[in-house]
C-alpha cells in the first residue's frame, strides 16, 4: 500500500462515526426532552386521532430541517471557534450581535414564566389530589417555590448543574417506562370518535387549525437550539482542520438527524400512549385545568373507581413526582441561560459594556430580582400554559431557529450555496406559521 493510500485509509477510519458523535447525539436529544414534552400530548391529542397522525408525519422534518438550518448558520463563520453571536456579527455587524442577544434572552425568559406557572399548578394539584391536603393560597405557593429555587441557585449553582445533568437520562427513561406502563390501560375512545363523514378541515376546531396550533407546540417541545452553537463549535474544532468544512457540515447534519429521530420516537410514543389511555375530551380538560399531562394522568388514576392495583397507585404518585422533577430541571437549566442573557443586556446598556463598573454579584442580584419577580407575577396570574407557549415561547424560538437562518442564507455570501432549496421553503413556512399564532391568539 502506498503512503497516499495509507493516509486516505487512516483519514477515512478517523472520520467515521466516533464516540464524541454519539455523545453529542445524546446531548442534543437530552437538551430537547424537558418539561415542554409534558404539554405536547395535550395539544397533539386535543383534536383527536387524525391531527396527531398528521403531526407524526411533520415531527421529524420540523426537528431535523429547522435545527440543521441553524447549524449551517453557525458553520458559516470564518472562525471555527466562533459562537453564533460572533457569526451573526460577522455577517450583519454589531447590530446583528445585539439582535441575536435580545432574541436569545426573549426566547428563554418566557419559558421561565411558563415553568413558573407549571410548577405552581403541578405542586398544587399534587398537594390537593394525591396528598389530600386543603387548598393553599396560590400567591404563597408560587412565592415559596420560587424562593426555594432562588435559594438553591444562589448557594448551590455548581451542584445544581451536576444534578441537572444526572436527571436528564432518568427523566427520559421514566417517560419511556410510563409510555410502556400505560399500554394495559389503552382504550379505543380516540378511534371511536373518528367520523370520516363529519370531518371539518377548517374552522376553530378543524383539522388544519389544530395541526397549525400543534406545529407551535412541536417547535417548543422539539427544541435543542440553545445548544446548537456549542455543538457546531465542538464539531468544527474536531473535524474541520483535517477533513474540511463540507465534511463537518455533513457530520453535523448526520448527528442532528439521529438526535431528531430519537427525540421524535420518544415524544410521539409518549403522546400516543397518553392519548390512547385518556381521550380527546380528557386532553381538553387537562388544557382547561392548566396542568401537564402527567399531573392529569395522576388525577385520572386517583379517580378510578373500585380497588386500584398497586401499579395504578404507584403510577398515580410517580407521575406527579416525575412531572415536578422535570419542571425543576427545566427551570434551573433555563434560568442559567436567562441570567447570562440578562446580565449581558444590563452590562451592555446599563454600564456600556464596562465590566469594571459592576461586580458579578451585584449583576446577578439585579437579574435575579427581575427574573424571579416577573416569574412570580405570571405564576400568580395563572395564564393558560398552552396559550402562553403558542403566543410567546414558540414564536420567539421560531424566529431564532427558522427565520434567522433563512434570512442569513439569502443575505450572507458564505451561505449562498444553500439558496433555492425546497427545505428552505419548508423551514420558512414552519417559522411563519408558528409566529402567526400570535395573530390567531389576538383575533
From Swiss-Prot:
Membrane topology term reads: Multi-pass membrane protein
Record's family? Belongs to the amino acid/polyamine transporter 2 family. SdaC/TdcC subfamily.
> What is the name of the protein in this document?
Threonine/serine transporter TdcC
Q: Which InterPro entries match?
A: Amino_acid_transport_2, Hydroxy_aa_transpt, Thr/Ser_transpt_TdcC
Catalytic activity line of the entry = L-threonine(in) + H(+)(in) = L-threonine(out) + H(+)(out); L-serine(in) + H(+)(in) = L-serine(out) + H(+)(out)
Transferase is among the record's keywords = no
Query: What sections of the protein cross the membrane?
Result: 22-42, 44-64, 97-117, 140-160, 163-183, 207-227, 261-281, 319-339, 366-386, 389-409, 423-443
Known NCBIfam families for this protein?
PRK13629.1, stp
GO CC, sorted alphabetically, is: plasma membrane
Top-level taxonomic group: Bacteria
**Which one of the record's GO molecular function terms can you name?**
threonine efflux transmembrane transporter activity
Q: Which residues form a coiled coil?
A: none
Q: Supply the alphabetized keyword list.
A: Amino-acid transport, Cell inner membrane, Cell membrane, Membrane, Symport, Transmembrane, Transmembrane helix, Transport
Q: What is the lineage of its organism?
A: Bacteria, Pseudomonadati, Pseudomonadota, Gammaproteobacteria, Enterobacterales
Q: Organism source for this protein?
A: Citrobacter koseri (strain ATCC BAA-895 / CDC 4225-83 / SGSC4696)
Asked if the keyword Cell membrane belongs to this entry, the reply reads: yes
Function of the protein: Involved in the import of threonine and serine into the cell, with the concomitant import of a proton (symport system).
**Cellular compartment(s):** Cell inner membrane
Amino acid at each position: 500500500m502506498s503512503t497516499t493510500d495509507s493516509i486516505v485509509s487512516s483519514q477515512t477510519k478517523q472520520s467515521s462515526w466516533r464516540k464524541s458523535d454519539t455523545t453529542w447525539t445524546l446531548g442534543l436529544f437530552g437538551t430537547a426532552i424537558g418539561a415542554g414534552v409534558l404539554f405536547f400530548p395535550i395539544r397533539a391529542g386535543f383534536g383527536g386521532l387524525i391531527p396527531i397522525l398528521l403531526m407524526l408525519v411533520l415531527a421529524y422534518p420540523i426537528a431535523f430541517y429547522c435545527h440543521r438550518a441553524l447549524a449551517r448558520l453557525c458553520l458559516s463563520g470564518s472562525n471555527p471557534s466562533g459562537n453564533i453571536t460572533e457569526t451573526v456579527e460577522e455577517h450583519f455587524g454589531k447590530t446583528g450581535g445585539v439582535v441575536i442577544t435580545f432574541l436569545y434572552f426573549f426566547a428563554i425568559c418566557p419559558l421561565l414564566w411558563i415553568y413558573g406557572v407549571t410548577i405552581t399548578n403541578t405542586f398544587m394539584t399534587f398537594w390537593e389530589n394525591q396528598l389530600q391536603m386543603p387548598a393553599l393560597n396560590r400567591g404563597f405557593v408560587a412565592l415559596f417555590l420560587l424562593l426555594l429555587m432562588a435559594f438553591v441557585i444562589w448557594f448551590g449553582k455548581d451542584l445544581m448543574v451536576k444534578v441537572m445533568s444526572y436527571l436528564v437520562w432518568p427523566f427520559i427513561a421514566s417517560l419511556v417506562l410510563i409510555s410502556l406502563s400505560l399500554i394495559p390501560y389503552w382504550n379505543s375512545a380516540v378511534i371511536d370518535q373518528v367520523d370520516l363523514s363529519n370531518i371539518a378541515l377548517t374552522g376553530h376546531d378543524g383539522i388544519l387549525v389544530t395541526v397549525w396550533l400543534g406545529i407551535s407546540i412541536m417547535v417548543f417541545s422539539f427544541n435543542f437550539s440553545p445548544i446548537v452553537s456549542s455543538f457546531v463549535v465542538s464539531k468544527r474544532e474536531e473535524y474541520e482542520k483535517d477533513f474540511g468544512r463540507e465534511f463537518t457540515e455533513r457530520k453535523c447534519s448526520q448527528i442532528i438527524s439521529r438526535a431528531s429521530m430519537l427525540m421524535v420516537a420518544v415524544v410521539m410514543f409518549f403522546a400516543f400512549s397518553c392519548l390512547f389511555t385518556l381521550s380527546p375530551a380528557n386532553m381538553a380538560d387537562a388544557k382547561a385545568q392548566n396542568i401537564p399531562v402527567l399531573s392529569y394522568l395522576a388525577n385520572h388514576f386517583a379517580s378510578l373507581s373500585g380497588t386500584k392495583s398497586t401499579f395504578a397507585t404507584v403510577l398515580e404518585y410517580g407521575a406527579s413526582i416525575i412531572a415536578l422533577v422535570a419542571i425543576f430541571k427545566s427551570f434551573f437549566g433555563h434560568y442559567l441561560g436567562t441570567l447570562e442573557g440578562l446580565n449581558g443586556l444590563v452590562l451592555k446598556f446599563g454600564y456600556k459594556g464596562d465590566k469594571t463598573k459592576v461586580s458579578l454579584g451585584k449583576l446577578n442580584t439585579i437579574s435575579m430580582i427581575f427574573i424571579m419577580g416577573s416569574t412570580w407575577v405570571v405564576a400568580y396570574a395563572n395564564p393558560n400554559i398552552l396559550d402562553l407557549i403558542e403566543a410567546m415561547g414558540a414564536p420567539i424560538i421560531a424566529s431564532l431557529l427558522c427565520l434567522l437562518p433563512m434570512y442569513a442564507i439569502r443575505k450572507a455570501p458564505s451561505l449562498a450555496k444553500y439558496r433555492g432549496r425546497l427545505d428552505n421553503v419548508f423551514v420558512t413556512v414552519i417559522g411563519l406559521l408558528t409566529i402567526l399564532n400570535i395573530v390567531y391568539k389576538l383575533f
